[in-house]
Regions:
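N-terminal lobe of the biotin/lipoate ligase/transferase fold
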Residues: 1-149, 182, 199-200
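Conserved phosphate/anionic-ligand binding catalytic regions in large, soluble enzymes, centered on
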Residues: 160-169
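Short conserved catalytic/interaction loops centered on acidic-Pro-aromatic/His motifs
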Residues: 126-131, 162-163, 175-179, 220-221
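C-terminal accessory segment of soluble enzyme catalytic cores
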Residues: 138, 155, 173-221
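Short glycine/serine/proline-enriched coil/turn segments at secondary-structure junctions
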Residues: 84, 158-160
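Glycine-rich, charged/polar anion/phosphate-binding loops
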Residues: 149-156
């Protein structure tokens, strides 16, 4: 059984603390044979940049004073990947799962999350795909117009996961211009709104993403 939680608009620091506590709790329960709950958490964050454990600080193009001027924060975090942006109009999804319940390794799990987002895009008539050597979901792959619509970065310990994905829905894409997103200098960023040229209902996107992740996990369990 998987519990779905919607944390609404929540500061990155509070969400990080809450998901870390749930992550540690699940690992402890798993290792000690106690009952536990698999969770998928949805939320949005105020303007924030997160830099993965192997990320390069040079991919943040603003100094602390400039960050303050655009009302954004910067956090170094314990996930894979480089730097990315989170903000209003973007769904962040944090699955806190015991992957062994779903017979998944980490690589297969990331592939599953990508597949769910690809299928969400398809429901809006948008063709999305993966890029070899890069995580996340992309549009116009293999062309000069290649652009990213969903970033991913996960931490795993004892096959328990935290962190997850960030899907741009009605995101203010200007905030990506202050970084080299995910460490890429020559690739663009997009959103459902930018592709469809109209605002997209946030709840509708979350419902579709939730349904597709659950369907794909059910197939593997």
């Amino acid at each position: 059984m998987i519990t779905i939680e919607n944390w609404g608009l929540i500061s990155y620091s509070e969400a990080w603390e809450r998901q870390t506590a749930l992550f540690d709790e699940l690992i402890d329960a798993k290792l000690n044979g106690k009952p536990y709950t698999n969770r998928i958490i949805f939320c949005q964050h105020p303007h924030v940049y997160t830099l993965g454990k192997h990320g390069k600080a040079a991919n943040m193009l603003l100094n602390p004073k400039q960050l303050q001027a655009i009302h954004a924060e910067l956090f170094q975090v314990d996930r894979g990947g480089d730097i990315t942006y989170h903000g209003p109009g973007q769904w962040v999804c944090y699955p806190i799962l015991n992957l062994e319940d779903f017979h998944l390794g980490l690589k297969e799990y990331l592939h599953l999350l990508e597949e769910a987002v690809i299928r969400v895009c398809q429901t809006y008539g948008i063709e999305a795909d993966r890029v070899h050597g890069a995580t996340g979901v992309w549009l116009a792959t293999g062309t000069p117009g290649e652009r990213k619509i969903c970033a991913m970065g996960v931490r795993s310990s004892h096959f328990v996961t935290m962190h997850g994905l960030a899907l741009n829905v009605n995101t203010d894409l200007r905030y990506f211009s202050y970084i080299h997103p995910c460490g890429f200098i020559d690739k663009g960023v997009t959103s459902l709104q930018a592709e469809l040229r109209q605002e997209v209902p946030m709840d509708e996107v979350r419902d579709r993403l939730e349904q597709l992740i659950l369907e794909l996990l059910k197939e593997t369990a």
